[in-house]
UniProtKB/Swiss-Prot annotation, chain B:
Gene3D superfamilies xref list: 3.30.70.3270
Chief site of localization: membrane
Top class in the EC scheme: translocase
Listed name of the protein: NAD(P)H-quinone oxidoreductase subunit I
InterPro entries xref list: 4Fe4S_Fe-S-bd (IPR017896), 4Fe4S_Fe_S_CS (IPR017900), NADH_quinone_OxRdtase_chainI (IPR010226), NDHI (IPR004497)
Localisation: Cellular thylakoid membrane
All copies of domain 4Fe-4S ferredoxin-type, residue ranges: 55-84, 95-124
PROSITE patterns from the UniProt entry: 4FE4S_FER_1, 4FE4S_FER_2
Species of provenance: Synechococcus sp. (strain WH7803)
Cited NCBIfam families: ndhI, NuoI, PRK05888.1-3
E.C. numbers: 7.1.1.-
PANTHER family: NAD(P)H-QUINONE OXIDOREDUCTASE SUBUNIT I, CHLOROPLASTIC (PTHR47275:SF1)
Amino acid sequence: MVTFFATNAPALVSPGLDLEQSFSQTLEGFGLSDQAARLIWLPLPMLLVLVAAVVGVLVTVWLERKISAAVQQRIGPEYAGALGVLQPLADGLKLLVKEDIIPARADGLLFTLGPVLVVVPVILSWLIVPFGQNLLISNVGVGIFLWISLSSVQPIGLLMSGYASNNKYSLLGGLRAAAQSISYEIPLALAVLAVVMMSNSLSTVDIVSQQTGAGILSWNIWRQPVGFLIFWICALAECERLPFDLPEAEEELVAGYQTEYAGMKFALFYLGSYINLVLSALLVSVLYLGGWGFPVPVEWLAGWLGQSVDAPLVQVITGATGIVMTVLKAYLLVFIAILLRWTTPRVRIDQLLDLGWKFLLPLALVNLLVTAALKLAFPVAFGG
Amino acid sequence: MFGFLKQVGDYTRDAVDAARNLTQGLAVTFDHMKRRPVTVQYPYEKLIPSERYRGRIHYEFDKCIACEVCVRVCPINLPVVDWVMNKETKKKELRNYSIDFGVCIFCGNCVEYCPTNCLSMTEEYELAAFDRHSLNFDNVALGRLPTSVTTDPAVQPLRELAYLPAGEVQPHGVDPSRPRAGQRPDQVLSSLKQNAGGSAGNEGESATSTNTSKGSAE
């Protein structure tokens, strides 16, 4: 779609569907200038991704409630819409009309700024999530690095809201969130670095393209099993999901940094945490599970069926399967995250930091070194 | 050197063990997903309170002799017995009687000691109110009988404790239409009636008739 930076897509992958080009061509057919067509096009993918993110959150909340219920031999939401699908919508509506409370001796400005600072980077990170060769807002050259740097803005917001609440539980929750995010960012970045080293690019599109050669066999999970585990554990810690939900541990800290929040500000935290979960799942599928790639390469399928990859219908089907595959993989991971939530007990803060600094960090370093060695030894298999 | 290697080996073994345990745990939670729900869908389904359930207290004004035993045995002297001495008949005349269920602990001592059995326990437990003073029941309110779970047409009565049908051990894939184990009070009554009819005709067949009635109930 919109490409601010030059894409260096490998020549062997077909350019696929380019909606922006077709759209601009249509508008230019109406006599608009190139610039005007671009200006009209710009907000469309952004809006689309924003809506997709919010719908993704609604689905995730519903899934979380239904799967949690099933794991505990309950039924879960049932009466709001068929099978309770409208329950998250009802929850959101409730939060929207609730009173907006700022505690008496809290810092009003920071208290308001906190949730915004938590949500904005997470939504901004959707910029780099590809659903197809050209189906992303911006193929930024530094793609995955942008996500890592954006996700380190989040703890500042958490710390801010925890400190501004003028509440000891909030402060402790905020501090824990900051400590957790900082200690898990490093192994996360190292795990990503190993993938980046193999695909020779930080761009998410290139990372996926590099995994599309032989379908499921070329997915990074086979070449980076340790990296996959490190990334998934760190992603769970970054999302503050159980077993790493210390910042909001109900039994100890009421609700952590969210304690004093109500109404729309609380909804922002809630939205942020679930968007972050979906985003992390999407990025795991992009980095390790072949992104939009079908288990069998679409090019092969088209070849067996005697169709050209460039035929319009094939392109549309390829695009659709791309979106479905990305979402499917992401939601499989979301399911695992929800199941893990009811399987694992919460770790203690010392165990959390131990795991981060003494286990994941050395392991990620070793993984990086081994990847580098393998890349030098077998450049064919490890993207030399 | 070997010490270091041993450390690394132990560490690896621990990590592998942790992974195995985690997988085992995930298998357990995954296995729970397709089981029959244990929950009672409350406003639509209700558990039948047990026989000697201590719910809201029922009181019969006409039986009461204003002896105030209930007040004496009550841990906090809760019942308010408002009576006056009629000088002419030399008898107590009861005016009002009330119990505040916002304070009552439902110990049942008053019911136990009432000499005329004018106090009794009901199976009513839905005592939520917007104002705690509305829980102070006077003799009129105390005389009302609650709607029974088994006769309320809006409620599906459920037997307590067992959530699986009789004879079922595996909670997986149980048909949702099959009821829980145990008979509902009306089924118990009908089987008793059948039993009585069978025993009047033939003493020897009473056992089989019990069996058939049980079978039909399930």
